[in-house]
């Protein structure tokens, strides 16, 4: 893995913004939450286009995502969060299946332009993971790290890791239902149930996802956007 020179694309890659699943605490999909008048998913699309990316798609079965000027890949995602720590379905099934190189971006993340640039410029011939990492930037919202996405060139490796992650879940090998961190532990061959903050690309600015109204207020009132 290394950073490519600015503006150099080593291979054609699609960017998929993941907007599936159900979060019952939200009246509408939280990827549609407006930050200073702009839906989060629209902001991500805009930042990608400003950085020179045109092959962009959204995965969702919700009709509201048809209006953003990019392809919508209709893909059933039965992951359902219905409480603070309660969920059903399999989170790892949310990645649109394809043999092509794809960068999967989580749709509820408020990305900075620099974060998008870092993701674009990171080269890999396998799979790379992006998340925040301590020590956190002063403008970062949360006291813990959050995941932002995966860049996948070796889809075979990635799909095998997803299936292994699901198998380990059934076997009770995880301390919780597996999400991005657990999937990355399997992809990278790391220790299960332990976050290694050194084996992925850390993005340390205000980039973060939204989980509750306080997160929204943080971004709406922040002067850094």
Q: What are the functions of these language-model segments?
A:
Residues 2-9:
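N-terminal amphipathic/hydrophobic targeting modules at extreme N-termini
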Residues 9-28:
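N-terminal nucleotide-binding beta1-loop-alpha1 segment
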Residues 22, 108-109:
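Active-site metal-binding loops of divalent metal-dependent hydrolases
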Residues 38-54:
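A short, N-terminal amphipathic alpha-helix
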Residues 66-103, 110-113:
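Short phosphate-binding loop-to-helix
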Residues 111-204:
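Conserved core of the sugar-phosphate nucleotidyltransferase
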Residues 198-225:
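C-terminal catalytic/acceptor-binding lobe
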């Amino acid at each position: 893995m290394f950073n490519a020179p600015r503006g150099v694309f080593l291979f054609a890659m699609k960017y998929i913004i993941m907007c599936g699943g159900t979060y019952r605490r939200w009246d509408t999909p939280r990827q549609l939450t407006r930050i200073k008048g702009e839906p989060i998913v629209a902001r991500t699309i805009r930042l990608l286009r400003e950085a020179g990316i045109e092959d962009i798609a959204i995965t969702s079965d919700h009709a509201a995502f048809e209006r953003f000027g990019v392809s919508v890949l209709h893909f059933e995602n039965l992951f359902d969060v219905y409480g603070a720590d309660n969920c059903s379905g399999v989170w790892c099934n949310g990645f649109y299946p394809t043999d092509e190189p794809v960068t999967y971006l989580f749709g509820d993340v408020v990305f900075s332009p620099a974060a998008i640039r870092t993701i674009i410029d990171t080269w890999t011939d396998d799979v790379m993971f992006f998340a925040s990492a301590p020590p956190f930037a002063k403008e970062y919202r949360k006291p813990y790290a959050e995941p932002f996405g995966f860049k996948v060139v070796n889809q075979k490796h990635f799909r095998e890791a997803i299936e292994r992650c699901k198998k380990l879940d059934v076997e009770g090998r995880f301390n919780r239902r597996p999400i991005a961190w657990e999937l990355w532990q399997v992809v990278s061959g790391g220790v299960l149930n332990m976050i290694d903050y050194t084996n992925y690309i850390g993005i340390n600015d205000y980039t973060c996802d939204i989980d509750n109204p306080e997160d929204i207020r943080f971004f709406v009132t922040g002067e850094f956007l």
